[in-house]
Amino acid sequence: MAGKKNNNNGQYIILRTPEQQVEIDQRNARRAQMGRMKKARQPVQRYLQQHGLRNGLSGRGGYIVAPTSGGVVTRPIVPKFSNRGDSTIVRNTEILNNQILAALGAFNTTNSALIAAAPSWLASIADLYSKYRWLSCEIIYIPKCPTTTSGSIAMAFTYDRNDAAPTARAQLSQSYKAINFPPYAGYDGAAYLNSNQGAGSAIAVQLDVTKLDKPWYPTISSAGFGALSVLDQNQFCPASLVVASDGGPATATPAGDLFIKYVIEFIEPINPTMNV
């Protein structure tokens, strides 16, 4: 029974029933949670008050205002190597390929298999090991077209090499974590290439490494991979980058570069002459 009781020191002790104590604990937990949420929102609210809204984030969409002019300067970083037990971990950022807007607004699509041999610098490292896995893999779009360039681009990962190529940008836009953007967007990505901070308003897609089919994939050369059937390619390739564009200008225009920022782990060294 709830009430008060006098202890040996002459102080009153409040007695509560178990039901009352549970209710009080729940109320205190709700108050603490609301306090944490309010505190977590303060930096965001303060930033918006000072700077206003920025270009939309890749992770949740937003808006882009075409700049009157723009340019990007990129510098390569020194690749970083580390070891964990018997494995070798490599961190680097490099150009994967570029995206072209087809002439007269025609639809255009590209498909890049994300095997360890896909990035040109990493390919020579992959030859030295039997197996690999992506610990982190992001594709960052850096524009290089005029800011008046028309068109739209969609970018997404697919997880089955047997999937048919999209025939319209709308099809690719329905893929898991797909992103749509104008070709002139993404200047902020230059600062993200060599940074460990959040992507901010960079145009980027992140590979969900927690949902891949296998824990490890065999390494293979690009030539050997290309000679396989699409079903066999799934044994070596965890995912593919698919990019689609339409609505471009009258003449074919290079829209931008696609950089790959990765952390990859290799195991089981092998002589490269044997690893085909």
From Swiss-Prot:
The keyword Oxidoreductase does not apply. The lineage of its organism: Viruses, Riboviria, Orthornavirae, Kitrinoviricota, Tolucaviricetes. Residues 1-85 are annotated as: R domain, interaction with RNA. Residues 86-266 are annotated as: S domain, virion shell. One of its GO terms (molecular function) is structural molecule activity. It comes from Tobacco necrosis virus (strain A) (TNV-A). Residues 267-276 are annotated as: P domain, projecting. This is Capsid protein. It comes from the Viruses.
